[in-house]
Amino acid sequence: MSNVTWTGGEEHWIQKGDIRLFMWQKKASSKVPHAGTIFFVHGSSMASQPTFDLYVPGRPYSSAMDWFSDHGFDTWTMDNEGYGRSDKHRDINFDISNGADDLAVGSQYILDKTGATSLLMYGISSGALKAALFTERHPERVAKLALDAFVWTGEGSHTLDQRKKKLPEFLAQNRRPIDRDFVHSIFKRDHPDTTDAVTVNAFADAILTLDDSMPTGTYVDMCSKLPLLDPTKITVSSIILRGEYDGIAGMDDLIDFYKLLPNMNKQFSVMRGISHASFQQKNYMMVYHILNSFYTMPEPAYQG
């Protein structure tokens, strides 16, 4: 395995009480108009930099942070407590609510540091649940919310049906081991041809540079405690991104959630040829385009 290092950004360290949390920033390019401030939220089985600032030889803009910063966005991400460079010492399983607490602290730091008045949120998988829960709690800090690989009740989720078989194991411990085979399994479970081996190997190298185990809390939540959200309380402009082959959620589950979102400035996008972990797919540039379009769309002049 090759140990991965990250360059071109700025480290920030913040406190959640006595817990130390890692944040990573890549500033907007000065060559284009400023487009906003994005806060990226990682999922259950990888920290922030492997997900959003990945380098893959021969694959342009594997780093979403690089692409969006070059398009005028100030980009931020953080390792939730229990992941990556952030503190891991507490004897808890670092569940989704705890992750939303991290986002509350991280978002306030970004607003204070940059002078931004609100953020463009993006969360993937359990990170989407954290981002949505944070938005429920702090809608005044969020301009727009993007939920990728999202799940609401779990109804119709093939991935969660399989994961529930290991629920007793997840309940019995606060962390679960991961290795290279596990990372590859993420891309094999739904539709294996949506990714290439070079990208998955680079992703595995990056993940395993920072972690050899992951918290069980988000798995426990997604297997036994859904729904965690009330869509009627998510009042900001939102988009749901659903990979064509992603088994994390049934289509009807997502449509039902979407129908209940009260803000009519909302979108639902099915992404062709994509399974789970959209930024590591062959069609990743399509995902960037969809997100960029959503984030930069003007506010409607007439709202009824």
Regions found by a protein language model. Give the residues of each.
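N-terminal cap/lid segment of alpha/beta-hydrolase-fold proteins
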Residues: 1-32
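Short, surface-exposed "cap/lid" segments of acyl-processing enzymes
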Residues: 30-73
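Glycine-rich "HGGG/HGxG" loop immediately N-terminal to the catalytic nucleophile
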Residues: 49-50, 76-94, 276
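Conserved acidic catalytic loop of the alpha/beta-hydrolase fold
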Residues: 100-118
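Conserved hydrolase catalytic core segment
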Residues: 117-122, 126-153
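Alpha/beta-hydrolase
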Residues: 160-241
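Conserved alpha/beta-hydrolase "acid-adjacent" motif
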Residues: 247-253
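Catalytic histidine-centered segment of alpha/beta-hydrolase-like enzymes
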Residues: 274-285
